[in-house]
Amino acid sequence: MKKSTKKESTHSKEESQTQAGNSEARKSGPSTKKAGEKTAEPEKATAGSGTEKSPEAACREENELLKDQLFRLAADFDNFKKRTARQMEENRKAVLEQVLLDFVEVTDNFERALKSAQTAEDMGSIVSGIEQLSKQFFSILQKYGLERIKCEKAGEFDPHRHEAVQHIETSEVPDNTIVDVYKPGYSLNEKVIRPALVSVARNPDETEK
């Protein structure tokens, strides 16, 4: 009788342990992880998640930046042109002012010469004064790059520096020889601004004789 009671007690104890194990299993939930398999970790948030720009937005932003730079460059260039124009105008006025001041000196000398001529008894002094004024005047022209073109009688005619206003038929001098100079020519910084006006010899055609 005692043995039966002991067996029942042991059986009851095993059932209690089994129920306790089942209860623990229910709490922890079914496990699907296989042996040797690592538990999957939650995906890490991508750096800058939510702030990354789309290609279209990046292009628009870059376009706006380039447009702003272009507008700034255009404004700077416009200001540069205005400054350059002002500087050129100031330089032009300064040069013109200096030229006029130089010729004012000649005007002063002309006035003094006229006063002296009214009381002068010697015409030679008047002529000498006029010659000095002519030299002073031309020296001012030379100061600004003006030169008289070389042109002499019996010299050779140069169509680039001389203008023939008359042809004189003669056999006394070679063809295209300058016979007379009517008006001197001038060049400014080696550029002809007025050719010398001359008459040129032209030898008669032998067939016309």
Curated annotation (Swiss-Prot):
Q: List where Basic and acidic residues composition bias occurs.
A: 1-16, 34-44
Q: Which GO terms describe its cellular component?
A: cytoplasm
| Subcellular location as annotated | Cytoplasm
Kindly list the GO molecular function terms attached to this UniProt entry. Answer: adenyl-nucleotide exchange factor activity; protein homodimerization activity; protein-folding chaperone binding; unfolded protein binding
A Pfam family that this protein carries is GrpE
Q: Which domain of life is it from?
A: Archaea
The protein's predominant localisation is cytoplasm
Region described as Disordered: spans on this chain:
1-61
Regarding protein family, the annotation reads:
Belongs to the GrpE family.
Against PANTHER family, the record matches this protein to: GRPE PROTEIN (PTHR21237), GRPE PROTEIN HOMOLOG, MITOCHONDRIAL (PTHR21237:SF23)
**Quaternary data:** Homodimer.
Stated name of the protein: Protein GrpE
Q: Which gene produces this protein?
A: grpE
